[in-house]
């Protein structure tokens, strides 16, 4: 089932626990002290300017450096991908049209498992879809993130523009290819961190 604004939180890692805790604190401040705030939870972003430690930019920049992608576990972890530009327009709509104290979920119905993401990236970059290595999965790695954006769509009239994931990935590959000067200074430190963690 997809996560809805009324789904009880059930965090499975310190990371997800910290996110759940922050939402609960905001709700308490709104209710107790009248703070004018909304909450937005988004699905996984991709697109220009994303830090190269993240899944998609790391796969792209590794390929651009001649390094085979490395996929955690079996790669069947599902993420609900949303282009960063769509995320931005959704946040703007929430800030300008959202109701105080409400929670809005930002997603683009882009559920795709990580193995398929790597296969698409490989194809778009001229490699065989299965040209990647499997590595040990991270502890506490959630199997599926998917959210129900219907409240955002029905109440605020928001709609994603980047609905073709493959086209969005092609644009993202082009951006990282054309902007190596932006990410190259970060690459060595990012890969050293992953190597130190055994990934």
Regions found by a protein language model. Give the residues of each.
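Alpha-helical segments that scaffold the active site and NAD(P)H-binding pocket
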Residues: 27-31, 61, 96
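Active-site micro-motifs of SAM-dependent methyltransferase domains
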Residues: 31, 44-47, 154, 175
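Catalytic helix-loop patch of NAD(P)-dependent Rossmann-fold dehydrogenases
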Residues: 1-39, 46, 50-52
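C-terminal substrate-binding subdomain of Rossmann-fold SDR/epimerase-dehydratase oxidoreductases
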Residues: 63-199
């Amino acid at each position: 089932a997809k996560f809805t604004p009324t789904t009880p939180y059930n965090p499975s890692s310190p990371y997800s626990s910290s996110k759940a805790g922050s939402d609960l604190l905001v709700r308490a401040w709104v209710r107790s002290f009248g703070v004018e705030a909304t909450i937005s939870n988004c699905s996984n972003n991709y697109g220009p300017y994303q830090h190269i430690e993240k899944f998609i930019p790391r796969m792209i920049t590794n390929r651009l450096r001649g390094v085979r992608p490395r996929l955690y576990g079996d790669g069947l972890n599902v993420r609900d991908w949303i282009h960063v530009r769509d995320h931005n327009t959704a946040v703007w709509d929430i800030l300008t049209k959202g109701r105080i104290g409400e929670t809005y979920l930002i997603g683009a119905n882009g559920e795709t498992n990580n193995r398929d993401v790597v296969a698409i990236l490989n194809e778009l970059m001229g490699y065989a879809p299965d040209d990647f290595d499997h590595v040990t999965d991270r502890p506490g790695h959630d199997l599926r993130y998917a959210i129900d954006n219907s409240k955002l769509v029905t109440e605020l009239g928001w709609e994603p523009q980047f609905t073709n994931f493959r086209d969005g990935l092609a644009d993202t590959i082009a951006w990282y290819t054309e902007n190596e000067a932006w990410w190259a200074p970060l690459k060595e430190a990012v890969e050293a961190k992953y190597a130190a963690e055994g990934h």
